[in-house]
Regions:
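Beta-propeller-forming repeat regions
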Residues: 1-237
Length: 237
């Protein structure tokens, strides 16, 4: 993930165990991560101010652990001293077969949603919405920055239809963002998107990359799909 972690106006990078300051790009510690069968247990790092203190924190998911954690930016002094970022639980999804995640604004309200992809084909696809947590701080009292200002609320797009591969983009041409997975795509309803299942179109059967990309490659006015082969070679559209 890319963003201004240290507040110096330059973009920095976050990747797994380390963050890299824009300019010298030297690795600096962020968190400890276990290995799983040769994989680093991290497959989705994203930057967001989770506690409302004005600094970018990290939200991260993984393969088999079911929890989504956020890691608290330690601020100027903590970053300078190379302190690990404090880990906090954001939500336990109860899902342990996660291929990858995206943090993307799906409904256009300016706040991103958390989308989880599974390598299992016939399991639900779930979007987790970040909603405002009720404020607990009393007037005049300094907010507790160890607490997230968001809660995560699940919305199941469909009971079946997932599989290796994940993207977001407008496939139907209605101006709304749809969700693409390895077995097809979910069409965002024109109204009440979070109050109903989304229509699933089983238009393909891919073992594809995370992410895939939706863009109009041939300039014919509709969204095309660029994808890599998951755990294989090749880039196709």
């Amino acid at each position: 993930a890319a963003g201004d972690v240290d507040g110096d106006g330059k973009p920095d990078l976050v990747a797994g165990r380390n963050w890299y300051r824009g300019g010298d790009w030297a690795p600096r510690p962020l968190r400890s991560i276990a290995d799983w069968n040769g994989y680093v247990e991290s497959n989705g790092d994203y930057l967001l101010d989770v506690n409302g203190d004005g600094r970018l924190d990290v939200i991260a998911g993984s393969f088999t652990p079911t929890e989504i954690h956020w890691y608290e930016n330690p601020g100027e002094q903590g970053l300078r001293l190379g302190k690990h970022w404090k880990q906090h639980l954001l939500v336990d999804t109860k899902n342990s077969r996660n291929e990858g995640q995206l943090l993307q604004d799906i409904d256009g309200d300016g706040r991103p949603e958390w989308i989880v992809n599974s390598w299992i084909k016939n399991v639900p696809t779930v979007i987790w919405r970040l909603t405002d947590k009720p404020k607990s701080a009393k007037p005049g009292k300094k907010p507790d920055t160890s607490q997230a200002i968001y809660e995560m609320q699940p919305h199941q797009l469909g009971e079946k239809g997932n599989g290796h591969g994940l993207a977001v983009g407008d496939i139907s041409g209605d101006g709304l963002t749809d969700v693409l997975v390895g077995q097809g795509w979910y069409e965002q309803p024109k109204e009440n998107a979070w109050g109903q299942p989304w229509k699933f179109h089983a238009d393909w059967d891919l073992h594809a990359s995370v992410p895939m990309i939706v863009t109009d490659l041939d300039q014919d006015g509709d969204g095309d799909l660029i994808f890599g082969k998951g755990h294989d070679y090749g880039l196709l559209w």
